Amino acid sequence: MSWGLSRVTVRFGDATALAGVSIDVEPGEVAIVVGADGAGKTTLCRTLVGLEGIDGGEIRRPDRTGFQPETSGVWNDLTVMENLEFVAGAYGLATDPARRRIETLLEVTGLGGARDRLGRQLSGGMRQKLGVAMAVLSDPELLVLDEPTTGLDPVSRLELWSFISLTAGEGKAILVTTTYTDEARRGNSVLALDGGRSLASGSVAEVIDAMPGALFESARSHGPSSWRRGRTWRIWSPEAEPVPGATEVSPDLADVVTVAALAAEARR
Amino acid sequence: MLAMTLKEFRQVVRDHRTLAMLIVMPVVLLLVFGYAASFDVDVIPTAVVGPGATNVPEQLPELFDVETADADATRANAEEMLRAGEVNLAVVTGDGPPVVLLDGSELFMARAAVQILAAAPIPGLDYVVLFNPELDTSAVLVPGLAGLIIVFVGTLVTSMSVVRERETGTLEQLAVMPFRPRDVFMGKIAPYFLIASIDIVIVLTIGTLLFDVPLNGSVLPLIVGALAFLFVALGVGVLISSVSENQAQAIQLALMTALPQIMLSGIIFPLSSMAPAVRWIGYLLPLTYFNQVAKGVMLRGAGLGDLLMPLALLVALGAVIFTLAVTRFRSQLRPARVRAAT
C-alpha cells in the first residue's frame, strides 16, 4: 500500500499553504519534494505526519511514521547514544533488539565514534544523520525527512543519501524534501511545489518529458521568460518557436521546475 | 546608536505579550499589592469556652470577633481549636479569672491582641501565647519562605521546559512519538520534583537548625502538603511554558505568578488584613495553603485531621493545573486531531 496525500488543502487563516496537493510514497521507494523556500515543503511534511490539520483531501499514513523535522530533531543536551535510547524508550522497543538496532544505525551512519558526544557538539552532517537514525529507529513504514541535506557539505550530503537509499532498500516508504533540484534524481518520483501548489509530478524522466514548449540557451537575457543559469541564459519558448541567436538545449529538472513556475505564473 | 535603539524598539513593540506585561502589569501589581500591604489587624477570630462563655464576650475588645461561645468546652478544646487554626484567640473561663490563649503562629494577630490587652487591661484577665511564646518572627516566616523558595526555583526552571523544546524544534519529535499528553507532563516535572523535594527538605532542615524553628507536629501532613505543593508549583511552570512563545516570555510569566505569592499568600501580610477581592486572589495561590500546612505542623503541632482543608485545596489546585496543562499539551502535540478535515 502506498502512503501520501490526496488533493490535500491546508490553510492558515487566509493563506493557503497547500492547495489540493497529492503525492504517493511507495514502500521501498524515495519520493522527493522539491521547491524553493516557502513552497510548502515543511507544511506538506507536517501534514503527512499529523502535525497539521487539513481543510480538505485525504491523508494515508501508517500507524508508525518516522519524522525528522527541519531542525534535525536532535536533543542538544543529550549524547548521540542518549538521543537514540530515548527514541527507543518512547516507542517501547525491547532493550536487546533496540540496542542491536542502535548499534547497526551507529555503524551505518558512521556515528559510532561520536556516541558519547552531545547533540550540540555534532557537526551539521552528523546532526542530520543522527536525526534520520532517530526517525528510522522505530522501524516505521513511512519515513518523512524535511530538508535533511540543507546546509550540508557535499561529502555529508553523499553520506546521508547513501543512508537514505539503504533505508529505502529495507522496504520503507521515504519522503524527502529538498531545495536542491539535483537531488531529485536520487528519488523514484518527484513532486515540484511552488506557493503550495503542485507544479509537476512523476518520475524525473516523466516530469522532464512533460515540459511544455522548448528550451534554448543564449549569452544574453530574453525578457521575463529567461533566467540565468551559470554563465549563460536559459530561454523558455512556450510554443517551441525558435529564439533568434539561441541554441535549443535539453532541459534538466532544474529547468523544468523553473518553466513550471513560469507557466503557473502566466496562468495566474 | 540610533539604529540599535530603533531595532530594539521594533523588537519590543512586535512582542505584543511582553509589551502588554510591561505596561499593564505594573498597574495591576501596584493595585493588588497596595490593597494587600497592610499589617493592620481588623479582626481576630475568637472562641470563648467554659462556664462564663455567655457572659465574657460582651467584655472583650471589639477586635476579638467571637465566633464560638461554648459553655461546655474546656481549655483542652480551646487549645485544639487553636491548633486546628479554627480561631486565633481563645478565652477560657472557669472558677478563677479568665485566661486568654493566643496563637503565636499568627504573629500579627497575636501581637495586636497583646497590645490591646496591655493597653486596656481587663481586671484579672491573663494571657498565654501558645506555639510561639516569644512571638519570634523567623519561626513564623521560615515555613512559608521554604515554600516561596520552591516557587521561585521550581516554577522558573520548569517554565522553560516546553518552550525550549519548541525553540529547538524537538517538540515536533515529541508530537509524533506515541506519548500521551499526561506522559509528557509527568515526564517533564518528574526530575524537578525529585530535586525540589530535596530542596525543600534542605531548606526546612536549615530553618529548623539555624533559626530554631520548632517541628512540633508529625511530619506526615508536612510531607503530604509539600508533595502536593511541589506538584502544583512545578505544574504551573510547565503550564506557563506551554503557553509561552519564547523563553523570555516564560520567565516573565513565571515571575508574574511568583510575585503575588510573596505578597498575597499570608507569609508577610495577614490574609485577614487584605481587601476582600485581594484576599480571594490569595485563596487561589498554592503557597497560601502550603504556608498554612507548614506553620500548622511546625509551630502548632497540627495533625492530618486539623489540616484537611488546606491539604484538600492543594490537591484540588494540583488537579486543576494538571487538567489545564494536559489539555494544552493535547492541542500542541496533536493539533491535527483538533482541527477537523472537511
Predicted regions and their residues:
Chain A
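Conserved structural motif at the start of ABC-family nucleotide-binding domains
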Residues: 3-5, 18
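The feature captures the beta-strand-to-loop junction immediately N-terminal to the Walker
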Residues: 34-36
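Helix-to-loop junction immediately C-terminal to a conserved catalytic motif
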Residues: 49
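Conserved ABC ATPase "signature" region
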Residues: 85, 89, 96-114
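Catalytic Walker B motif of ABC-type/P-loop ATPase nucleotide-binding domains
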Residues: 143-147
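ABC transporter nucleotide-binding domain
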Residues: 159-175, 179-237
